[in-house]
Amino acid sequence: MKKILFSFALLLCCLGLAAAQDYNCFSVIAGRSATVDGSVLMAHNEDDPGEQMLNIYVMPATDKSLRYIWCEFPGMEVSDVFMNQFGVSVASNGCPSREDKGDLSGGGVLYEIRTSVAKYARTAREAVAIIGSMVEVFGYKGSGRSYIVADPTEGWVVSVVKGKHWVAQRVPDDQVMTIPNYYVIGEVDLDDEENFAGCQDLVDYAISRGWYKPETDGSFNFAKAYASEKSLTSASNQRRHREAWNYFFGMERPGEFASIPRKKVSLRDMMNVLSIHDVLTGDSRIGHSICNDNTVLASIFQLRPWIEFDMGCVMWNAMGHPCCQTFVPWYAGITEAPANLGRFKTAQEAEAKHMSDAKDKHKNYPDHFYWKYADNWDASYDPSAEQREIFKARRQFEKETPKDYNAFIRKFY
């Protein structure tokens, strides 16, 4: 891991800079021994308020970078999700920290972190190294964030703090990790390079700021030392974490970083969890549910080590609220996306104009496909008995999709 960190440092020195918007999201990683089919499963709900417009592109490979599927929200620096040709997948959750200083070089980095993972990482472990290198070289300029990264063999959580401090933990193969918008990494052992990585002064810096007092606090706990207290006590964060824990573990009180689920996790389970919405459940407790009014994309990454990357790695996308949209598979081997799914003809143009072409999206692109999905959300949120029947019918259709898909895979692989 240390060698990989060093090898990426020079490459990262030429990267550009950008600014942050932190909104609610939710993510899950299930290790390959915890899943029904032996895949690593990573799931993510992207939640962003305001006028959002999803575009989907396939960025071609170059001599220096990999091919990747890119789910883009114009103008957003912390919202896009990616899966590259090796199945390396990345998404993130805003996790506010208590850091009020933060050492930055050249203005720090933000959006470039996820794009660099998509372009250069051939494994999740390399993705961890890239993120760590960027944070240590430039500094992270947001308050705090946890990147979730996975490949067909393992998944990781990489938590960064404003400035140059970071830590990463591997999700055990037989366990499931869930994360709302607060840090979930607790006790850290940087000597265990198989399961942890991070900056060397992580503990010493916390001591120097008075965030960790060894004589009274016991073992060092990253989340307790670095997290914003408001994020840890947020009703929405706690509610979404409880909902996931209740589903996977049969309990509502979040415990360790990850735990063994009460049964093997399937693709369908991930769809169910991302779709938990109080409109359907009738749950009136305080705080946002996992699926909520700000959910603009739900993605599930099914990463199977026993099939070649092109067919074995699939990004399942529900374009909007997953409680009322169907998940559609995107294979890692595709070389281009349907033309109507992007506002530009090429991914290269979209990349060049990601920040500059981000205002008045509905006005400038009135015929964009995404607005039809947004209209469907509004229509589907009528809590009438008739509308609930529509939900049931859509769910039944979606329930059959993984069965047909798995039958196809078994036939040819």
List each language-model region with its residue ranges.
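Short, well-structured alpha-helical segments that form the helix of a local strand-helix-strand
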Residues: 127-136, 267-280
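Substrate-recognition/cap regions that form aromatic- and gly/pro-loop-enriched pockets
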Residues: 279-407
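Sec-dependent N-terminal signal peptides
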Residues: 4-15
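Second-shell loop/turn segments in exported
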Residues: 102-103, 112-121
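A contiguous strand-loop segment
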Residues: 21-110, 130-255
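Secondary-structure boundary elements
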Residues: 120-129, 133-142, 263, 305-308
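Long, repeat-rich segments with strong aromatic
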Residues: 234-270, 274, 292-294, 301
